[in-house]
Amino acid sequence: MMAFITVKPEIKNNLANVAKELKIDEELLKSANRSAQKHQLYCPGYVIEEHSGKELQTIQDIKRFLQPRQLKLSDSWIEQEKIYDDSAVEKEIKKIIDVFPFVSCREIGRSVLGRPIWELKAGGEHAVKKVHMNASFHANEWITTSVLLKWFKEYCMSLCCNSPFFGFSPIKLFNSTSLSLVPLVNPDGVDLVLNGSEVMGARRDELERLNEHRPNFNEWKANINGVDLNKQFPSLWEIEKYRKPTAPSYRDFPGISPLTEPESIAMYRLITENPPDRLLALHTQGEEIYWGYKGLEPEESAAVIKEFEELSGNIYKGVRDIDSYAGFRDWFIHHYFKEGYTVELGKGQNPLPFQQFSHIYNATSGILWRALFFHE
C-alpha cells in the first residue's frame, strides 16, 4: 500500500493550487493521485510512513508536515550503488512506488520458481510515445539491474524537483513518453548466481550438474531450467537451434522451441499487448550497442545511435549487424520494424566486478535519458 497523508477533502478540489504551493508539477501530482480517495493526498518525492494521523486542514499544515520528509537528488537512497537479488528488487520496488506514487507496478508473469516478474510504468496521462527498458535477461549480467534501478530513481526524483539531465526536461519527457521498465527478467537465475545453489532446494543437484560442477555459478546465463531466455523468441529461432546446445545448459540452450519458458512468455506478452515505439535491453559486456537486424530497423535508428554514442562520452560504439538470432530485441525489430537497442554495458568477463559500477553508470545514464526523447 502506497503512503499518503490524510487531508481535508476540499483541499483536493484545487490540485493545481496544491501543486503550486508544494512546487510539484501539476500533471505529476495529478498522476500520483489518480486512484486516491477524496481524503488521501499522495505527494511524490517525500518519504512518508503510512499516515493515519489527524486530518490536515490547510495547505500550510501539509507543507509543515512534508518539509522534513522531502528527498533530494543527492539523497543516499537515490545515489546508492547496490547489488540486487530478487528479494532486494521487491523491497526497492515497494519503496519506489511509496516515494514516487506516479509510478505504477504490476506483475506481468512468474518465473519457473514462482517469483513475480515486475513491470514499473511512469508517464503522463496524455503521453503519446512508449519506451520499454529491461535488465537481467541473463543471470550473470545482474549488474544491469543495478544500473537500471539507479537510473529510474534518478529519473523519478528529477521529476519531483524538475532538474534537467543531459539537457532534457524530465517533465517534458514524462508528459510525452510513457516508460515501461522490467528491472529483473530472470529472478531465479540472478538469485542462483548471487546466492548459490544452496537456496534452490530440491533442484540443487540438477543445477550443479548443468553447471558442470564448477565452484560457483558465475558463468550461468540461463534461467533455472537451463534455457537462455534471450534465444527464445520467434525470429529465425531455427538458426540458433542448429548451432547451440541441444539440451539444458548453464548458457546458450535456446529451448526445444520458441517461448517455452514463463519468463520469455511474460516478456513476449508484455510487448504484443502494448508494443512500444522504442526498446532498450541492457546486457553485459563489450561497450557496444546493437541496433540493426536484417535491415528491418527503421531509418531513425542510425541517427539515434550516434546520439547514444555521444552521450556515452563515445565509450559505447554502435554495431549495426551481429551474428545473433531469436533474441528479444531481434524479434521486436523483425515483427514491429521499430527501434530496438541492445546495450552491452562495461567490459570484461561476466559477471562484471561491481567496482566497475560508477564507470558503467556514468557511460550509460545519458543513453537512458535520450531513450525517452522523440523528435516532434
Swiss-Prot record:
Residues annotated for Zn(2+) binding in this entry = 138, 141, 283
Q: What is this protein called?
A: Uncharacterized protein YqgT
**Any one Gene Ontology BP term:** proteolysis
Q: Kindly list the GO molecular function terms attached to this UniProt entry.
A: metallocarboxypeptidase activity; zinc ion binding
Q: Which Pfam families match?
A: Peptidase_M14
So which cofactors does this thing need? Zn(2+)
Name the active site residues: 344 (proton donor/acceptor)
Q: Which family does it belong to?
A: Belongs to the peptidase M14 family.
Q: Which UniProt keywords apply?
A: Hydrolase, Metalloprotease, Protease, Zinc
Q: Which PROSITE patterns match?
A: PEPTIDASE_M14
Record domain Peptidase M14: where: 82-372
Which species is this UniProt entry from?
Bacillus subtilis (strain 168)
Which Cys-Cys disulphide bridges does the record give?
A: none
A single Gene Ontology CC term: extracellular space
